[in-house]
Amino acid sequence: MEYLSLLTGRPVPDRVESWRDASIDQIVAYIDGVKPAATPALDRRLHEAIQRFGVPVSAKEFATIERFHAAFVDAGLSLRFHSFGRPPQGYYPTYRELLLETDQKGRTRSYLASEGDFQFVRSLEGRDAVIPVVGDLSGTHALTAMGRWMTEHNERLSAFYVSNVENYLFRDDGFERYMENLNRLPHTDRSAIIRSIFGRFGLPDSVPGYYSTSTVQNLNELLANFSAGKYQTYSDLLGR
């Protein structure tokens, strides 16, 4: 409750500890029912929180952070993805919809679905275990550096979320280099690739009314099939 209130600029409720066992539906209803605080107060609180980290932040960087936070404050839980040069499409989910989404068994699965789920993700952040890596999946640096670090620390890949980037890699003739990069990552027989499939590439088992489908594939299976020449197009990869 406290996290989502601060993220959207809403006042944290009194006796916030009493919300510890609240459902995500109850938390969302609270956020939707209150107005955000005044912008100057939010900016002061944001600056104070960032300064406590002890990391030097320039005025330009503060302005960028304020702009990002303002998007969450202004739109609240109705915030949705925007791409450059065009308004959001009607099938883009809102933040509210993502928080309330359930799997096919009716279970909510966001990291805010329960206090335990949130604390697990929070503990990763607290240990600096969430590390952004910016790079080209078919390039020569990002995945190579990750593989080197994993080897040095005796780590093995559990899961790799690739979204729908493989579609673009096929278009740009980068899929083979991407396969080579994946093969360099230390992995096990249980390592998995998670992908999102959109629009016209939807699968027979896609849920009606949804624009995207998530699938899981064993990494060793992916690499073996590629070596056998089974993936010449993106549709081949999706099994269509």
Regions found by a protein language model. Name each.
Residues F120, D128-T151:
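Adenosine-cofactor binding site in Rossmann-like domains, unifying the SAM/SAH pocket
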Residues R122, G147, M179-N183:
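Short amphipathic alpha-helical segments and helix-helix/interface helices
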Residues Q26, A41, H141, A145, ...:
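Extracytoplasmic/secreted proteins, especially bacterial periplasmic and envelope-associated proteins
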Residues A142, L169-R171, G202-D205:
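Extracytoplasmic/secreted cell-surface and envelope-processing proteins
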Residues M1-I131, P204-Y210, L219-R240:
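Class I S-adenosyl-L-methionine-dependent methyltransferase module
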Residues T188-V216:
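Extended, Lys/Glu/Leu-rich amphipathic alpha-helical scaffolds
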Residues E152, R156, Y161-G199:
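C-terminal soluble interaction/assembly domains
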